């Protein structure tokens, strides 16, 4: 009988024999963005957007699980936001009083501070 992903992982972790070897993956942020094409700012800061993306990739590639890299999640990221500029497909510039952030599908955000930290 075929196991569910959860049963398969639990069996392997308990040193029991699963129906097959559990398959897991850890995507880079750039790879996830290129696959999903989300709003790059929401993907970086919004927990639900990030979680939905992980679930979609797990289902798309039929993995038993995904190893999660936690990153910029912040509930108050909009608090000091001065402006948001769309620079092209999948590319956004955020302006804050102390810094500029460039978000894109290809890589992690690039942050430039206005004064030395």
Q: What kind of region is each of these model predictions?
A:
Residues 1-117:
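Catalytic cores of TIM-barrel enzymes
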